[in-house]
Design a protein with these regions (language model features):
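Accessory alpha/beta interaction modules
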Residues: 1-166
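Short, charged alpha-helical interaction segments and adjacent helix-coil junctions
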Residues: 2-17, 89-94, 192-287
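Short acidic (Asp/Glu) and glycine-rich catalytic loops that position anionic groups and cofactors
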Residues: 20-23, 167-171, 193-197
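Short hinge/gating elements
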Residues: 25-32, 172-176, 201-202
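Short helix-to-loop capping/linker segments positioned immediately adjacent to catalytic or ligand/cofactor-binding
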Residues: 116-121, 138, 157-158, 176-179, ...
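Short conserved micro-motifs at the rims of enzyme active sites and ligand-binding pockets
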Residues: 142-144, 179-183, 231
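Intrinsically disordered, low-complexity linker/assembly segments
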Residues: 165, 171-173, 186
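A conserved mid-domain beta-alpha-beta active-site/ligand-binding segment of alpha/beta enzyme cores
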Residues: 189
Length: 287
């Protein structure tokens, strides 16, 4: 697919101010990568250190359905991509802090890896890579990384057990920590595109990068589409409601724990009082 060429008035180049819905909105993230295969190819090339000519095909295996509800738990967050018919890449945009993200990401990766059909050989299993774009530190805030990669290794020798089961994280809060290799692959450019809040930022990023320019145009056109905006708004509302409910559950749990502590303290006091009464009665009886 060729780069989208901006046209006169319908171009991000003429847009100014705040971006209504950026690519950290998981619906916007999905819809742009689904509609613009050129952008999807560019993103995959950056993440996997591929040259564009090395990517023959990138195909989304779980496209969004037009009538699919986006404001419930059944909405599929991850994007399953078949690369060159030889590897499966799972992409996820996750801005809200998830206490169980490590377990959930492993679950996603296992589902992608478990692709063997009946009658096929285990050797036919394609490499599976889950890549999460996060707004939080999933492992440790003491040693923050921008782009981290995890795989199965021998704990003593560090020899890889398999290169077919890989989990990676792009920490959108740690763009400044990007390594020289990350910058050479323009992964920091993609991260800045995803987190951009104004069209002015977008224009600066797109100046010398055709993939970013194409993504910027798709972002502009998607924001101009009423149905897409409604879907993005529905996702934001749902996530906000989900976060509010989670906070309320946390507060209730804290209150219950506090009441339980107070009840335990009162019970201890009652025991002490009863013990003192018994001792006093024994003293009085002795006298």
């Amino acid at each position: 697919m060729n780069t989208i060429k901006p046209t006169t008035s319908l171009s991000y180049l003429n847009a100014t101010g705040l971006i209504p819905y950026g690519m950290t909105n998981d619906y916007m993230f999905r819809i742009i990568l689904e509609k613009n295969n050129y952008v999807l190819k560019g993103l995959i090339c950056s993440l996997l250190s591929f040259k564009p000519e090395e990517v023959v095909s990138v195909e989304i295996q779980n496209p969004i359905l037009l009538n699919e509800a986006v404001d419930d738990k059944e909405f599929i967050l991850d994007i399953k991509v078949l690369l060159n018919n030889s590897a499966v890449i799972n992409l996820e945009m996750q801005m809200a802090y998830q206490l169980n993200w490590k377990e959930r990401s492993l679950s996603y990766l296992c589902r992608v890896f478990d692709q063997l059909s009946h009658g096929h050989l285990y050797g036919d299993i394609k490499p599976a890579i889950h890549i999460g774009f996060l707004n939080f530190d999933p492992v440790s805030s003491e040693h923050p990384e921008f782009y981290s990669s995890y795989r199965l290794l021998n704990e003593k020798t560090y020899i890889p057990y398999s290169d077919k089961f890989i989990l990676r994280v792009v920490n959108l809060r740690q763009i400044a920590s990007a390594t020289d290799e990350d910058r050479a692959n323009r992964i920091d450019y993609w991260a800045r595109l995803f987190t951009a809040t104004t069209w002015e930022e977008i224009k600066m990023l797109a100046k010398n990068n055709e993939f970013i320019a194409s993504a910027s145009q798709s972002l502009y056109e998607s924001n101009a589409d009423e149905i897409t905006r409604e879907k993005c708004r529905a996702r934001e509302n749902y996530i906000c409601l989900e976060r509010t409910l989670a906070e309320q559950e946390t507060r209730l749990a804290e209150q219950e724990a506090e009441l339980a502590t107070k009840d335990a303290a009162l019970a201890d006091k009652d025991k002490i009082i009863e013990k003192l009464k018994k001792q006093l009665a024994e003293i009085q009886s002795a006298n």
